[in-house]
């Protein structure tokens, strides 16, 4: 083994060891390779030889973009400052002090600012946006020079308005009594206690109750002693004019036996009071100083007056009628 090691000799160019016979062949080849660089072998060209396939040009490798320096330290400091400011604001809100001014906005230095709209974009987005923003700003400038303001709102088209409803003339305005809320059994013939308003034949004076105001009713329905004498209480005018007719009366509100018993028991009235005349059938009206007889039931809604000296109905508010 020692003899073989002594026989090996190193090459002066590459430093490798060879036998003396092999070294003589290696030295001239090593000198050529050191002077002239070896070409890279392209297997694609070798496979394409003898065929119709065109030799593809080798793709040049793209230069690697320079690596950006990481700004992790600056981002870390901004994050810590944001957390501290949030804690300070929460403490001030608990104590009730004045809020400090907001911190200045932080910008990413890697972003590119647009010279037209002053916004910031990534490098790839900025390359597309700046060209578009440049053309848009040029168009807007031409519109302003032409006299059109882009910020001005467009003119609004006139909207169609429907015609207003026709109002009734003062002569056709209904009386206050007709505007009052009516009970559900309004206009239905019922049987029960007779009301002050009676149903008369067509052409009779009793039809004036539905077309005239309460004040006009009082002036037209007062009977004088010379004309026919005062009627007794609770005697309907229709029975006096037509004693043979047994028709039911048109009332605003129906009463049953239970409803009639409650107000009498509460107010202390007796059923015998309905047939007795009040002050011999004559009382003096407080407002117009005319002698007449007061009704015990409202001629509008049929509600019984709770007291003898009531001037208005407690349900519908219509003035009490004097017969």
Swiss-Prot record:
Signal peptide: none annotated. InterPro entries: ZC2HC1A/B-like, Znf_C2HC_C3H. It holds the Pfam family zf-C2HC_2. Residues 35-75, 138-273 are annotated as: Disordered. A zinc finger (C2HC/C3H-type) spans 7-36, 110-139. Zn(2+) 2 binds at residues 114, 117, 129, 133. Transmembrane segments: none annotated. Residues 208-226 have a biased composition (Polar residues). Zn(2+) 1 binds at residues 11, 14, 26, 30. Keywords: Metal-binding, Repeat, Zinc, Zinc-finger. Its cofactor is Zn(2+). It comes from the Eukaryota. One of its GO terms (molecular function) is zinc ion binding. Residues 40-50 have a biased composition (Basic and acidic residues). The keyword Transferase does not apply. Belongs to the ZC2HC1 family. This is Zinc finger C2HC domain-containing protein 1A. It comes from Xenopus laevis (African clawed frog). The lineage of its organism: Eukaryota, Metazoa, Chordata, Craniata, Vertebrata. The gene is zc2hc1a.
């Amino acid at each position: 083994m020692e003899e073989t090691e002594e026989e090996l000799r190193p090459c002066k160019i590459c430093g490798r060891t060879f036998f003396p016979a092999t070294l003589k062949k290696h030295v001239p080849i090593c000198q050529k390779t050191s002077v002239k660089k070896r070409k890279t072998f392209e297997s694609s060209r070798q496979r394409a030889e003898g065929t119709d396939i065109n030799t593809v040009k080798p793709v040049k490798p793209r230069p690697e973009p320079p690596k950006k320096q990481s700004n992790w330290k600056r981002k870390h400091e901004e994050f810590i400052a944001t957390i501290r400011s949030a804690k300070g604001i929460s403490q001030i809100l608990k104590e009730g002090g004045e809020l400090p001014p907001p911190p200045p906005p932080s910008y990413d230095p890697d972003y590119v600012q647009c010279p037209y709209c002053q916004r910031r974009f990534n490098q790839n987005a900025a390359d597309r946006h700046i060209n578009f923003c440049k053309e848009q700003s040029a168009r807007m400038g031409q519109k302003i020079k032409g006299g059109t303001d882009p910020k001005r709102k467009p003119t609004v088209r006139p909207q169609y308005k429907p015609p207003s409803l026709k109002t009734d003339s003062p002569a056709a305005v209904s009386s206050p009594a007709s505007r009052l809320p009516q009970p559900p059994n309004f206009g239905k013939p019922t049987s029960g206690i007779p009301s002050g308003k009676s149903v008369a034949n067509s052409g009779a004076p009793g039809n004036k109750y539905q077309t005239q105001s309460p004040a006009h009713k009082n002036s037209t329905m007062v009977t004088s002693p010379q004309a026919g004498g005062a009627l007794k209480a609770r005697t309907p005018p229709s029975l006096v004019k037509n004693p043979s007719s047994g028709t039911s009366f048109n009332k605003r509100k129906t009463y049953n036996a239970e409803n009639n018993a409650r107000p009498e028991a509460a107010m202390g009235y007796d059923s015998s009071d309905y047939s007795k005349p009040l002050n011999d059938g004559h009382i003096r009206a407080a407002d117009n100083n005319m002698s007449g007889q007061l009704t015990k039931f409202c001629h509008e809604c049929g509600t019984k007056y709770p007291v003898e000296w009531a001037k208005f109905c407690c349900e519908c508010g219509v003035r009490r009628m004097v017969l």
